[in-house]
Amino acid sequence: MFAHSICAGGPLPWPDLPFRWDRSGTHQEVVVFTDTSLVEAVGRSDCFKVAWMLESPRATRREYRWLWRNASAFDRVLTFEQGLLEALPHAKFCPLGGCWIAPEDWKVHQKTRNLSVIASAKRDMPGQKLRHEVIRRHSSAIDAILGRGYREIAGKIEGLGDYRYSLAIENCRQNYYFSEKLIDCLLTGTVPIYWGCPSIGLFFDKEGIIAFEHPRDLGLVLEQIGPEDYERRLPAIQRNLDLAKRYVYPEAHVWESIRDLF
């Protein structure tokens, strides 16, 4: 799933963890099978088999259906999907999170601009479509419309560091599912105007997040944001920055969930 990078959650250096991924296939005590490689576990009896579901069910419907039918093929299932967690005794909660912000930029930056959005050109998932709809409806209220779908930037810090707020829209809306789209905002002291995980209050201070469900809800929100609102939220912004550091590396949660297998 993430052979193009060292870490599953983004282009960061490897964290201080007592393991590294080995893709050579020569070490087989514990083997982790991600979404699209689950079927490779069938017939294997030479290792502990771990299923790690990285994508949401909206993105990998076929893989989730297969796992529901074949969950017993694995010694452990790592997932954020609520149904699997409730149904499978060998399932463990493993949040996605992730981060595309360099560690030296994890701080509350001096904010000089109000609102940004970063969007690719993709329009497949519900949240991807919603990003473009929000931009179409509310472009006059957005200071910077960035990303490969609009104006490409060298790094996400360019679209977050200077901004009090940023529209952070997940690819889908699902309990326990949140990604770097949220984490990157929190790590830069930027208040996410957020569409995504309905249960986000279980993980972060909701005073530092402005959640919405439909583009029509945004008009009033965008009228009320600004320096005074941001200053009022600063204690929650700092709390969320500290909390977000727990979710930078998905591998940290993987390790906590499988360390007993070694």
Task: Identify the residue ranges that each predicted region occupies.
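Pol beta-like nucleotidyltransferase catalytic core
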Residues: 1-53, 58-144, 149, 156-166, ...
